Amino acid sequence: MNWLQLADEVIAGKVISDDEALAILNSDDDDILKLMDGAFAIRKHYYGKKVKLNMIMNAKSGYCPEDCGYCSQSSKSTAPIEKYPFITKEEILAGAKRAFENKIGTYCIVASGRGPTRKDVNVVSEAVEEIKAKYGLKVCACLGLLKEEQAQQLKEAGVDRYNHNLNTSERHHSYITTTHTYEDRVNTVEVVKKHGISPCSGAIIGMKETKMDVVEIARALHQLDADSIPVNFLHAIDGTKLEGTQDLNPRYCLKVLALFRYMNPSKEIRISGGREVNLGFLQPFGLYAANSIFVGDYLTTEGQEANSDYRMLEDLGFEIELTQKQEEAFCS
């Protein structure tokens, strides 16, 4: 297949077929540079060479009643993670200050659990109001299944984006978790959209799904019209249902990122959890398809040193996208 020609067609408005999507995932490793060249043409058309940086604040760790097979915070997990209740507003603000100083444009407040309590939403809302005033960061909240009134409160507080991943295809969902449904996840994204918050929803690759499952989740996110799509690659943690699972290699991970770009050409594609473990030395190539990364640690696993990420972006000739307040602070 001529990947540059397909890229031009995508830029012109074509939506790729299932056969074309599978061709991306099944493409020969020898053609991977041509595939990524096409993905970069699409990425460059919409985002140039800018990269959005994101940072996670793990606001509540562990104690989750859900049985998600990939997650060390699940009630079914025996992984020896640090567990703590919802942190204070002051701790959230301290994290936002670090994000601002490290040129992170999007600050992600993430909490374990099925869904937030009224107190949790109040703490986040109060913190967000101050974050917007002091630092001007884009704020993404990820607090689980969300109710209408909670979404409205977060919107009024200034939350820009809400993350709730679909994680996998509808067909494969029951293999990953049984304590909530695929429809529960879709409904939360729809609630977020209804209340004017930008929807962020993505996938976890490497959970014993088929290639067709990967195509289906990429298309589902296209149909859901998620503005931001985090693509995670399973970092199998001992003590979870999926411990020992290692179905990925760096070349396949690049093909997955390319698929998400061809399928969702204008969206923010973020290389997320498992980037360092699964992409390895091919990490830089991922940014020819994606235009966003997490900097620093993830929820219960360590990420690459921030300085290594900054050096990687510099070596690639890419530019960090700053907020207006960061432009004023660092570029004046």
From Swiss-Prot:
Binding-site residues for [4Fe-4S] cluster, renumbered to this chain: C64, C68, C71
EC number: 2.8.1.6
Entry-linked PROSITE patterns: RADICAL_SAM (PS51918)
Pathway annotation from the record: Cofactor biosynthesis; biotin biosynthesis; biotin from 7,8-diaminononanoate: step 2/2
Catalyzed reaction equations: (4R,5S)-dethiobiotin + (sulfur carrier)-SH + 2 reduced [2Fe-2S]-[ferredoxin] + 2 S-adenosyl-L-methionine = (sulfur carrier)-H + biotin + 2 5'-deoxyadenosine + 2 L-methionine + 2 oxidized [2Fe-2S]-[ferredoxin]
Molecular function terms from GO: 2 iron, 2 sulfur cluster binding; 4 iron, 4 sulfur cluster binding; biotin synthase activity; iron ion binding
Listed Pfam families: BATS, Radical_SAM
Claim: Transmembrane helix is one of the keywords in the record: no
Keyword annotations: 2Fe-2S, 4Fe-4S, Biotin biosynthesis, Iron, Iron-sulfur, Metal-binding, S-adenosyl-L-methionine, Transferase
Domain Radical SAM core span(s) in chain numbering: 46-275
Annotated function: Catalyzes the conversion of dethiobiotin (DTB) to biotin by the insertion of a sulfur atom into dethiobiotin via a radical-based mechanism.
Residues the record lists as binding [2Fe-2S] cluster: C108, C140, C200, R270
UniProt subunit comment: Homodimer.
The protein's name: Biotin synthase
Enzymatic class: transferase
